[in-house]
């Protein structure tokens, strides 16, 4: 039953996250606009994630936090983004948003069994799985210029896609110290398309350049959290009431593979059906 819930969750999230979600010209560069990996509860604390843990909320930034879970937790999040873009001659306001993440975490040692058995182990274990966007590409920009001897030149720039992270978290805690590891797979495809139209020239010229970049690879990071207990409950010294948490995370070099496809089409002559007669077509692919 738990496997079915996880599978349904990830399948639904993959379709939702993959939908168009933003219009940011800056996402043209690199692999796109980076996406914060912390969830809503951490966002309410200003993105503080290294030392954050909670019995009911998830934190994939520091996997050690999963050992502090005391129940099964299912989290999904939405995001909204407002952009105000300004050029020398115009301004543009844009709202965008989508499903931000879907995650499931659970403890591997039931607190109910501890109550029934009247025993409390110093060991705790937690596990979780999450699907999150890692970077986003999305823009649609058009410029219109009038040049001497060429007339009106229209340049269109469009981009879509992004990269995503499927993450598996595991953690163990002994007394007040927890360690954890994230094992993840990053994948995704981004498309960048530039179109130039010389609409006043005869015959009309139309240049189109499309780049497809696919990225995939294994990533990982580790985390440690330790609670410095300041005060415990009077009737149970194992229950902390006040504490300070120190958390650290680290990661090594990630080996990501990319496939770069490029297509260039130059067309001339506007046909009666509104399409162009292809003049040249060039295609190339690069794997790195």
Question: Where do the language-model regions lie?
Answer:
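Bacterial Sec-dependent N-terminal signal peptides
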Residues: 1-23
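Subset of outer-membrane beta-barrel
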Residues: 19-288
């Amino acid at each position: 039953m738990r496997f079915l819930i996880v599978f349904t969750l990830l399948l639904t999230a993959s379709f939702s996250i993959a939908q168009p979600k933003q219009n940011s010209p800056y996402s043209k560069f690199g692999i796109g606009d980076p996406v914060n990996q912390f969830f809503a509860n951490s966002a309410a604390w200003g993105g503080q994630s290294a030392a954050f843990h909670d019995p009911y909320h998830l934190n994939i930034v520091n996997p050690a936090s999963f050992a502090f879970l005391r129940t099964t937790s299912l989290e999904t999040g939405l995001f909204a983004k407002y952009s105000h873009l300004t050029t020398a001659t115009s301004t543009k306001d844009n709202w965008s948003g989508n499903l931000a993440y879907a995650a499931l975490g659970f403890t591997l040692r039931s607190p109910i069994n501890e109550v029934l058995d009247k025993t409390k182990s110093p060991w705790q274990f937690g596990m979780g799985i999450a699907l999150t966007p890692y970077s986003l590409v999305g823009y649609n920009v058009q410029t219109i210029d009038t040049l001497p001897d060429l007339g009106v030149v229209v340049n269109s720039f469009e981009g879509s896609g992004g990269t995503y992270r499927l993450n598996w978290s595991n953690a163990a805690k002994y007394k007040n110290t927890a360690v954890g590891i994230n094992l993840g797979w990053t994948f995704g495809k981004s498309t960048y398309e530039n179109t130039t139209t010389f609409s006043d020239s005869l015959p009309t010229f139309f240049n189109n350049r499309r780049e497809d970049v696919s990225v995939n690879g294994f990533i990982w990071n580790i985390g440690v959290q330790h609670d410095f207990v300041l005060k415990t409950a009077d009737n149970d010294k194992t229950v902390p009431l006040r504490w300070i948490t120190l958390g650290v995370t680290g990661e090594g070099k990630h080996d990501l593979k990319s496939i770069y496809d490029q297509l260039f089409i130059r067309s001339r002559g506007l046909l009666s059906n509104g399409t162009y007669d292809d003049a040249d077509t060039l295609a190339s692919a690069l794997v790195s």
